[in-house]
């Protein structure tokens, strides 16, 4: 990960346009290719960002070089750097991801044992399928043999959908697995998360943990 604190202006050029006037900002360049621009507020949310895959080039601009981040759709973040206060790179390695709480971990075990809950003809390939950005909870095959990545949460929120989206973007670059579909499974799924998942072609499945624990395997069903 590269961390840059700089006085800069930022312009987004794509389907829309957006301009951030000159200010001191934190620029994050991550190993997965993503680039994000942060201010000293908004919690974890960036002012602007570019999701991978994207590419960074530099255009000469005299005293203010322009860093151009371009994604596969041709959209650009154009960062005009006026002054760099800090620039450092750090090797973080592969993150093990969040440690699931007891309910999430048990949901993963139960769903792996009874993967037909996801649909007739589903089979399990592997639990904790490792990727460069962390493990996918379940990798399955559907009734037609297509690969399906499953993210399991106790409470399904937007962050979980974003996490699954990143996994899908990466897995779909693998010519052996692609195309890979996504399933977002949780005890409760917030409306905003469901809307975002549906917009991205991710199927949502609501699980009843208590009934999954108490029923025989041939009585499992979705609610």
UniProtKB/Swiss-Prot annotation:
Its EC number is 3.1.-.-. It is found in: Cytoplasm. Pfam families: NucS_C, NucS_N. Keywords: Cytoplasm, DNA-binding, Endonuclease, Hydrolase, Nuclease. GO terms for molecular function: DNA binding; single-stranded DNA endodeoxyribonuclease activity. It is an enzyme of class 3 (hydrolase). It comes from the Bacteria. GO terms for cellular component: cytoplasm. The keyword Cytoplasm applies. Cleaves both 3' and 5' ssDNA extremities of branched DNA structures. NCBIfam families: PRK03298.1. Belongs to the NucS endonuclease family. This is Endonuclease NucS. It comes from Mycobacterium marinum (strain ATCC BAA-535 / M).
């Amino acid at each position: 990960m590269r961390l840059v604190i700089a006085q800069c202006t930022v312009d987004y050029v794509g389907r829309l346009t957006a301009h951030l006037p000159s200010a001191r900002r934190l620029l994050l360049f991550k190993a997965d290719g993503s680039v994000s621009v942060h201010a000293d507020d908004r919690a974890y949310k960036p002012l602007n960002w570019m999701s991978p895959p994207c590419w960074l080039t530099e255009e000469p601009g005299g005293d203010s070089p322009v860093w151009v981040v371009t994604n596969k759709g041709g959209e650009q973040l154009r960062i005009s750097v006026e002054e760099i206060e800090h620039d450092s790179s750090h090797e973080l390695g592969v993150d093990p991801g969040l440690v699931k709480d007891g309910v999430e971990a048990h949901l993963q075990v139960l769903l792996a044992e009874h993967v037909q809950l996801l649909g007739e003809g589903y089979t399990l390939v592997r639990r904790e399928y490792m990727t460069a950005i962390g493990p996918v909870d379940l990798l399955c095959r559907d009734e037609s043999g297509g690969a399906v990545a499953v993210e399991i949460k106790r409470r399904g929120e937007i962050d979980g959908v974003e996490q699954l989206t990143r996994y899908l973007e990466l897995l779909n670059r693998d010519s052996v697995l692609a195309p890979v579909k996504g399933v977002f499974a949780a005890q409760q799924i917030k409306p905003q998360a469901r809307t975002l998942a549906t917009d991205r072609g991710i199927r949502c499945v609501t699980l009843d943990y208590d009934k999954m624990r108490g029923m025989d395997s041939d009585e499992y069903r979705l609610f």
